[in-house]
Design a protein with these regions (language model features):
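Short Gly/aromatic-enriched secondary-structure transition segments
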Residues: 133-137, 248-255, 310-318
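Internal alpha/beta scaffold segment
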Residues: 303-329
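Short glycine-rich loop/turn motifs
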Residues: 93, 283-286, 387, 425-429
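Non-catalytic, conformational "gating/processing" segments within enzyme and secreted inhibitor domains
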Residues: 51-63, 104, 144-304, 326-414
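Feature captures eukaryotic membrane-trafficking machinery centered on endolysosomal pathways
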Residues: 106-130, 288-290, 416-448
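Non-catalytic interaction/Regulatory regions outside core domains
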Residues: 16, 58-72, 375-378, 384-389, ...
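Detector for small/aliphatic-rich hydrophobic stretches
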Residues: 2-198
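Extracytoplasmic/secreted cell-surface and envelope-processing proteins
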Residues: 127-133, 307-310, 344-346, 400-401, ...
Length: 448
């Protein structure tokens, strides 16, 4: 059987994940009764659910239409993050970071953005596709993960928080989307859903505008164009703009040199300070610097002399990362850290396959039957793209991430000498949530 390629995309200003579809045998033709409004058709399905189909009605030039009009956001189950969730999320974060890191290259990911996008996507998965996704995401069943994420995202993005999060689904009129899929993503992730024609330039502009707006301009756009076979895009965007609790002053900044991963010396602007939390492990030292409000903090980890950045990153584990932060000491530490900016973009398909999530990318075997249906086509993930941005400077930090899933058819301190941590060579850094110590962003700076 000749298959038509159906592309799917996931974008995350931290990550992007695409869905796609391929041809399948027609079903038995069971009759269904539909109810149609001006913009959508609600149809009972064989499994007792309903599906929503966006209708064109001559609106090719109009703005994307809201598909959540008939869906009221409910109060989804909520489970306060605990040590079980922290261990699962930390393991996912560090495994993703290790597999994504390329030797000697600046790398930046947002595990939270990727986790959110994949958690939304797995609400539409079944069978082996679902079991593989659950394993990669830490082994929690999807209801438990939804409950944890519901509570965690609410905590992180509460009133006056420096972190903002937004989720949206963009759906082609060819797709019959399960109402239960939309409902779950509304209840647990406050996701919005819109009808979109991916062949229109206006749709590209609207989606890029959504990305730009929800990352405060840190990530300007997701794509230049979509494959004409695209049928859905699921997106998560994160934006953090935080000021240091103790900003660097002008007299604490001076020029110097940074020895990059290739051994070359390059010019850098360094920020100097004395911090009060010191990290020491068997192969690295580091410090913690807080942002205003103390909910978020910056962590910088420098491999010991004689330990390469590559071997240090290869040794990282979720358990070890949490352990290092949980055992940090209240000790004065003199720090030297370069100002830096990093923009990162990459496909996560190979990384996620390596982690054990392969069926979701297989046009013949993927099962997203709880997400949507498309006549004679099978939906699968065709790509996952991750986009991130960070800027660390005297006043604070700006960081952004966006994840999109695109579906298409295929078809009190002791008196002692201060410690010293000088980040004048490649290092690992993270922005953490100080209540769980989980990394919201994690990266490796190998060059300036």
């Amino acid at each position: 059987m000749k298959l038509k390629r159906l592309a799917a995309l996931l974008l995350c200003a931290a990550v992007m994940l695409p869905l796609a579809a391929c041809a399948k045998k027609p079903d038995s033709g069971t009759s269904r009764t539909s109810q149609t409004t001006d913009d959508t058709t609600v149809t009972p399905t064989k499994d007792g659910d309903t599906s929503i189909t966006a209708t064109d009605k001559g609106n090719k030039g109009a703005a994307a239409q809201d598909l959540m009009q008939g869906i009221t956001k409910g109060k989804g189950a909520s489970k306060k993050p605990d040590s079980r969730f922290a261990n699962v999320a930390a393991s996912f974060a560090l495994d993703l970071f290790k597999d994504e890191y390329k030797s000697g290259k600046n790398t930046l990911i947002s595990p939270l953005s990727v986790l959110t996008a994949l958690a939304m996507t797995q609400n539409g998965a079944e069978g082996k596709t679902l079991s593989e996704m659950q394993k990669v995401l830490g082994g929690l069943d999807r209801d438990t993960l939804n409950a944890y994420m519901n509570a965690y995202l609410a905590e992180l993005t509460g009133k006056d928080s420096a972190l903002k999060c937004a989720n949206s689904l963009w759906i082609d009129s060819r797709l019959d989307v399960k109402t239960s899929f939309l409902q779950k993503n509304a209840d647990f992730y406050s996701a919005q859903a819109y009808k979109a024609d991916f062949t229109r330039k206006n749709t590209v502009n609207e989606i890029n505008s959504w990305v730009n707006k929800n990352t405060n301009g840190m990530i300007k756009k997701l794509v230049d164009e979509f494959d004409p076979l695209t049928v859905m895009v699921l997106m998560n965007a994160l934006c953090l703009e935080a000021e240091w609790s103790d900003p660097y002053t002008d007299n604490c900044v001076s020029e110097g040199t940074f020895k990059n991963a290739k051994g070359n010396l390059v010019k850098a602007e360094y920020m100097y300070s004395q911090e009060t939390e010191y990290i020491e492990t068997e192969n690295a030292t580091g410090f913690v610097k807080y942002y205003k409000g103390d909910r978020f903090a910056f962590v910088a980890l420098l491999p010991n002399e004689g330990t390469s950045i590559d071997s240090y990153i290869a040794s990282l584990t979720g358990k070890g990362f949490l352990g290092a932060l949980n055992s940090r000491k209240n000790t004065r530490v003199n720090t030297q850290m370069p100002k830096f900016k990093c923009e990162y973009s990459n496909s996560l398909v190979d990384t996620l396959k390596k982690m054990g999530m392969s069926t979701a990318f297989d046009g013949n075997r993927a099962n997203f039957s709880s997400m949507a249906t498309l006549k004679n086509e099978n939906i699968y993930i065709s790509d996952v793209i991750h986009k991130t941005f960070i800027e660390v400077a005297e006043k604070g930090t700006r960081a952004g991430a966006v994840t999109a899933v695109i579906a298409a058819k295929s078809a009190a301190m002791p008196v002692e000498q201060p410690k010293e941590v000088r980040h004048t060579r490649p290092f690992v850094y993270a922005i953490i949530d100080t209540r769980t110590n989980l990394p919201l962003f994690i990266g490796a700076q190998t060059d300036i």
